[in-house]
C-alpha cells in the first residue's frame, strides 16, 4: 500500500537527517523493531524521505541516518510526482524466488561505488505501513532489489558484503576513498 506522507520530491540544501558512511559502526548494528507506529515514527519516515530525495536516492534505511529502528523508505520513481513512496516498518521477507538476478547496485552510504550483486528476482514481504497497518507486498524488478538492499541495512549488512568480485570491490572502494577492511563478505 502506498505511503501518504506529504513530502515534496525535491532536493533540500539542508536535508533533515545526516547520512552515515561505510566504516561507521552504526551501519553494522542490527536495528530494533518498532513497537508502536505513531506520529514520531511518521516524522522519522518523512525526514528519511526528504533526506533520500535530497541525496538522489531511491531507498534509505533508518540506520543510514543513525536511527536504530526497523524503518525503510523506497521510491523507485523519484522523478514522478504521482508515484507514492513506500514506507516499511518492521519488514520481513516471507518468501523469495529461486530465480536470481545479477544487477548493479549503489548505496547512499557508499557514494560513487556501483557493483553487481546477485539477489532473488522476486520477494514477498510483510511489514507495517506508516499508519501501523499490516501489509504484504509481492515485488519484482527494481522494487524487489531495493527492498532487499534496504532490509539488509536493518540487519547490519551492506551491499558490498554481497559482491562476489573481491578484486573489483577493493579497487572501487579505494577509488572512492573507502577501505575494504569495512566489508564483511557473505559466503555465496
Swiss-Prot record:
Q: Which InterPro entries does the record associate with it?
A: Peptide_deformylase, Peptide_deformylase_sf
Report disulfide bridges, numbered on this chain. none
Question: Recorded E.C. number(s)?
Answer: 3.5.1.88
Instruction: List the Pfam families.
Output: Pep_deformylase
An example of a Gene Ontology BP annotation on this entry? translation
Source lineage? Bacteria, Bacillati, Cyanobacteriota, Cyanophyceae, Acaryochloridales
Which reaction is recorded as catalysed by this protein?
A: N-terminal N-formyl-L-methionyl-[peptide] + H2O = N-terminal L-methionyl-[peptide] + formate
The entry's protein name is Peptide deformylase
Amino acid at each position: 500500500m502506498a505511503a501518504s506522507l506529504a513530502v515534496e520530491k525535491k532536493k533540500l540544501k539542508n536535508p533533515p537527517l545526516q547520512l552515515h558512511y561505510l566504516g561507521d559502526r552504526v551501519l553494522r548494528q542490527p536495528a530494533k523493531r518498532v513497537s508502536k507506529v505513531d506520529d514520531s515514527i511518521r516524522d522519522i519516515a518523512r525526514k528519511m524521505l526528504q533526506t533520500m530525495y535530497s541525496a538522489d536516492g531511491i531507498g534509505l534505511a533508518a540506520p543510514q541516518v543513525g536511527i536504530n529502528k526497523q524503518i525503510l523508505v523506497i521510491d523507485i520513481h523519484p522523478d514522478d510526482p504521482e508515484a507514492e513512496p513506500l514506507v516499511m516498518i518492521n519488514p520481513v521477507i516471507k518468501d523469495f524466488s529461486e530465480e536470481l538476478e545479477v544487477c548493479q547496485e549503489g548505496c547512499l552510504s557508499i557514494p560513487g561505488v556501483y557493483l553487481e550483486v546477485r539477489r532473488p528476482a522476486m520477494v514477498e514481504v510483510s511489514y507495517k505501513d506508516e499508519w501501523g497497518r499490516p501489509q504484504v507486498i509481492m515485488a519484482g524488478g527494481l522494487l524487489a532489489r531495493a527492498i532487499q538492499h534496504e532490509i539488509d541495512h536493518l540487519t547490519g549488512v551492506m551491499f558490498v558484503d554481497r559482491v562476489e568480485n573481491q578484486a573489483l570491490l577493493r579497487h572501487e572502494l579505494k577509488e572512492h576513498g573507502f577501505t575494504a577492511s569495512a566489508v564483511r563478505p557473505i559466503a555465496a
